[in-house]
Amino acid sequence: MSTDRYNARDAEPRWQAIWNERGIFRTRNDDPRPKFFVMEMFPYPSGRIHIGHGRNYVMGDVLARYKRMQGFNVLHPMGWDSFGLPAENAAIERGIHPKSWTYENIASMKEQLQLLGLSLDWNREVATCDPSYYAEQQRLFLDLFENDLAYRKESEVNWDPVDNTVLANEQVIDGRGWRSGAVVERRKLNQWFFRITAFAQELLDAIDTLDRWPDKVRLMQRNWIGRSEGLEVLFELSKGSVAAAGTSAVKVYTTRPDTLFGASFLALSPDHPLTQHLAATRPDLAAFVADCKTGGTSAEAIETQEKKGFDTGLTVVHPLDAARTVPVYVANFVLMDYGTGAIFGCPAHDQRDLDFARKYGLTVTPVVLPPGADPAVFAVGSEAYDGEGTLYNSQFLDGLSIADAKEQVARRLERFRVGEQPQGTRKVNFRLRDWGISRQRYWGCPIPIIHCDSCGPVAVPREQLPVELPDDVTFDRPGNPLDRAKAWRDVPCPKCGAPARRETDTMDTFVDSSWYFLRYASDNPDKPLDKDAVRHWLPVDQYIGGIEHAILHLLYSRFFTRALKACGRVDVAEPFAGLFTQGMIVHETYKDKDGRWLFPEEVKLLGDGKAEKLDDGSPVTVGPPEKMSKSKKNVVPPEVVVDTYGVDAGRWFMLSDTPPERDSEWTQSGIEGAWRFVQRVWRQVQEAIELGAPKGADKPASFDAAATALRRAAHGLAHQVADDVERLRFNVAVAHVHEFANAFGQAIASARTASPVPADLAFALREAAEIVTRVVGPMVPHLAEECWAALGYDTLLAEAAWPKAEPELLVENTITLPIQINGKKRDDITVPRDATAAEVEAAVLEMESVRRALDGKAPKRIIVVPQRIVNVVA
């Protein structure tokens, strides 16, 4: 039997071609086997992938192949998140149309992904920029529109005054447009929204059911939804302020009514109606409000900017102490779309309020005393106190806990009246805001609405869908090209026939990815959203992707299924039963003497953190491992790995050593070690074929110790790796295969010294080769197919069953017990698992180490704890 090296260059493309020709990964919806739906977050087609992109796809592939071997009908699809701003940037910078750029990238990246040997059903491939995909998305939009879950309202956006365009929050850098560098303005535009807040409580409650999601992700979603229970409090304007304010009271939402006696100011949003009323006649306030409009619109941008305030000169009466008044400010950190757009500031117990109070010389009155603190000396310095304690400086609340004080304030203010209203009203608020989906860009899904001066927003008739993007647009000037596409834009109103205009905003690309898993479920292109297919396949059994999508994408997807369920389009509420967030592949960075980044293939590593350029031997600075990035050139193309080591070596390395949820460093020594192990498995299988029993040999009636040990190792491997893969512990599965290879190697070496090889050992060798081939199949599928063929099978390993471990071989016949003498461990003893206490005691007393410790004396007592420990009392 030949033990030549495994030739990956020959085997890998050959087996991939066979899989494709036979269509073995094509999934049928009418397959009677139990379903298993595994998918990885689909990629944006940016151009080329590197090996770091492959880790999550390989993990998903291992699970898909394993489940297929377990007898499941596996759906493992792939697609392209192909709308988005980078394509428009390419159009501007390179003069290439977004469609051409995108489809060229899809073709290139698909070719690269296919190198990885992934068991994907390419028949269900989707591209979100394809009209066949976004036609259904437009129908879904109309479903939401007709059910009042999609609506239009005026909202603030980030406006670049130089490029004359709206910027996403991530495009605002330090308050300036990322391309023009201009100071960004906040401008109000009519925008489309999805009413995600209608499902806020349901989305929050259902997090508790997601027991196969990482705790960190669940916590992030809870915090993003941000449910709070508080009190809406009416602060009456002082008599001298009512006329100027044009109103009698300001409504404030607070989660800390217990701290009301510590209030030293009221702060209004720049967009609050009272602010706008005052600014209409006060140029100084109007200028302040205009200044507040610069910078980003995100909550993060507002939170991190310098805190500024404007004293309106108005005062309000303290709701619990009519003798006190509180000044009213306008502050740039108060958001109009949270609570009521007005807050009261208690500087002693909120850091933001404290910073504001110190800046404007406002009083700081602590009202919560920390446990054990002396009220006579406790004071707030540079840090606010936000911990537990008892109330003081608070009149009737003194001595109460925070919880009791909140309740007392709520009850009292609920009884007080301001006009016809209670002064206090209990209120639940959510941090979650409705999802603004409007984007003033070309390369996105058109919103199927027509605007008519007489009829308002009118839905495009469904028979006219899809509203396709026009191809004849230009990117030679700032702004949205759709605004300039008159032939496309100007249409008659579907209701009255009068001249009208198409909506020129396109949808946020997060909409595209919020339902693509539903599209995968259908194998019928004429029914892209098939309710029966969705009922069959959903929820996704295992979703794999980066934790950077923990909030927006995953939360929007959870909303989308609920919204579509409310519209009668699907039956499922939760889209993903299991979620796994993988770590990244990281790599060292390299710079030449001039500070230019270098690709790894341009560098020769010398050891001890030193390196030089391959072409001229000049020194190279080696940086710490970082996320693979094209800009820093610390990327490894999959082609390099495939050409040099084979894709299976790359797959093995990606699965090895590091827990899959952590970052893994790509190293030359690591990939070389993986290649050597692939060769070792190949060699061991070949040797087992040479020395072992022929295919289909009868099982011997009995096995000696050596054969039994090998069989235990092989059956244990099948059992252990199955558990590892089910629990997504791929690195542990790899470790178990390494451990087995050592036992397999010892058995092969033993067989080589025997002449002839005993029949029981020959059978065990053959059985072990077949088991290890099937066990590594999901991880190194090309190698496994080659081994399977060498073992004499004309079927495909990819369609083989997972090996069933014999239960009796999973239980060891012997057990090792520690021996303690006077409480100190002295040795271990291995005895039959069913040995009696008397037999164990006798064996212990025969041990030389025990005799030496007893020094010829008889022990006072020997205590045998069955299958646990032996205690000797001397």
Curated annotation (Swiss-Prot):
ATP binds at K630. CDD domains: Anticodon_Ia_Leu_BEm, LeuRS_core. Keywords: Aminoacyl-tRNA synthetase, ATP-binding, Cytoplasm, Ligase, Nucleotide-binding, Protein biosynthesis. Residues 614-634 are annotated as: Disordered. Its EC number is 6.1.1.4. It catalyses: tRNA(Leu) + L-leucine + ATP = L-leucyl-tRNA(Leu) + AMP + diphosphate. This is Leucine--tRNA ligase. One of its GO terms (cellular component) is cytosol.
